[in-house]
Amino acid sequence: MATEVLDPAILERWNECGYYRLVGMRVERADGDGSLFRITITPGHTQLYGTAHGGILCGMLDAAMALALLAKMPADEGCATVEMKANFTAPGNPGELTGSGAVLDLGRRLAVARAEVHDENGRLVATSQGTFMRFKTGDA
């Protein structure tokens, strides 16, 4: 699948993020309709019971929400997570997981987004909603 992004600099910045490279998250889409990430769960991503660690899932949910927001925000703005709620609905078994994010509200100072993670069979593994603070980055 080809990557689509409103601003290629957003994609480049996220692909260079140390955490995302470390865990192997790959951005496939970031545009006005939201974001799409993939990760292949390997033994290095699992907890004691052999399924994806909740921290990996939360990192994926957080990234999906933030990138969906960044794709709709001006290039000279960033966002930071203020709060996030996650629900885990099924185990994230080894294999490919897909995370998607969408903007619910883009306010002047705060923004709200949601995200979901699904397994290879389309089963919902985790869902979240988060509030993010918008700020000027000074990079523009």
Regions found by a protein language model. Give the residues of each.
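Terminal targeting signals and extreme-terminal segments of soluble enzymes
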Residues: M1-A140
